[in-house]
Amino acid sequence: MEVPKAVLDRHRPDGPDPKPELQDCYALVSMALYGLGHSPAAFHKHLDDFFQNDGWEPLEADSCVYIKYGADGKVSAIAATFVDDAVVTGTDEALAEYRKFMQSGFTISDAGTPEDFLGMQISYDRKNKKIKLWQEKYIKKMAERYNITLSAKPPRTPMDYNKKLEPTQDGDELFDPTLYRSYVGAIQYAVCGCRIDCCFTVRELAKHMVKPNVNHAAAARHCIQYLLATAHIGITYEHGDYQRHYEKPKAGFIVRNGVIEMYTDASFAEDVITRKSVSGYASVKNKAVITYGVKGQTKVALSSGDAELRALSECKREADWLHKLRREANEDRTVRSNLTKLPALTIWEDNKSTITWVSNPCQHNKVKHIDVPLKNIRNAFGKLGELDIEYIGTTAQLADCLTKALAPTTHWKLIQLLMNIPCSDLPTSVKMAAAT
């Protein structure tokens, strides 16, 4: 559902009072404009008041998500807004009431069941209870804009795992870095959608936005070629119980339907210049990833356990937000009121030293310098009971592909599990390797 001319129809907020000597330096607009920085915020404020006056409740975890409760105290509808676009789900009665409610205050364009949203395509398999998100249209349009086509042997990974992108030396930078920055921005938009497989790559490319060189531009075009070759893949969510098996029995675990499982990993001293490590995390529900992130650590870790603990701290922050979100979005109003305790979130960690430091308060000699994040994790792990940290083997650590460039076989093994890609959708060049 869309609100055409949403910003233009809104009341213009009061501007500053210019000094008399600066009267000629200001222009007074008669309405809010899309080009003004405060225009989306002004419309959101109007929309927020409109929703709350009808009984919709915004989430504290995300102010753009609203919940409507029925007379029985159960959730009847959920609306997620993005400026002038909205996706709504709920009962048939609640959706009919929502349409009337929106039409009473706005001129709306109702597209029915969403098939495109923010550059993502959405398909539904109601018989098998599956939903797929992918970005084929956006990726093909991006490749056409940059005149990039598939070669006879398309890349199997978004980044060459045998090469590191090093900083540009004086005199080697591109004459005009504008095109390179456009490459990175276009790839990043795909990553913000559903292409988690390029998450680490776009982080590496973005480090060289100021002074890119020819090698950086070639790496960016390589990534776009990879996206074009795999434009048909996406994230598929399923409903139902299932179990995952790995080659090492001790590394295997059962993923429960409807339960959020989190994975965190770190690549120790990944940056060849600063020797700072890279943190990555991913949260999975209903067979596929729902949130993910990659971030360079701000301080140099002294060991792999040190780097993993800092990555665990970043993952814990995401877990805090997810814990709050699932409480607020729960179908039962009593759960949102903190009257019912939710089960702990499970975080899978592949470093035993890190798990020991968290679970054993006597282990402190090697972690005195990171005492604050450690105590934060221990508090959630022990006293609050919000986290459950479990060991998982390195070969089964799904977040490994977020912290480093991997060989094709390993890359696709992890990406297939994270995105829940059926074997039939895998690129021809990796089907055999991924199936073994």
Describe the residue ranges of each PLM region.
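A common structural junction motif
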Residues: 102-111
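Structured nucleic-acid-interacting core domains from mobile-element enzymes and related host factors
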Residues: 225-266, 338-341
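RNase H-like nuclease module associated with reverse transcription
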Residues: 208, 259, 298-436
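Amphipathic alpha-helical interaction motifs in eukaryotic regulatory proteins
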Residues: 48-52, 66, 99, 103, ...
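Conserved pre-motif C helix in the palm subdomain of viral-like polymerases
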Residues: 1, 7-69, 73-101, 174-200, ...
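Active-site-adjacent structural elements in folded domains
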Residues: 61-64, 166-175, 186, 247, ...
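C-terminal reverse transcriptase regions that engage the nucleic-acid substrate
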Residues: 29, 33, 37, 113-239, ...
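RNase H-like nuclease fold core
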Residues: 254-255, 259-307
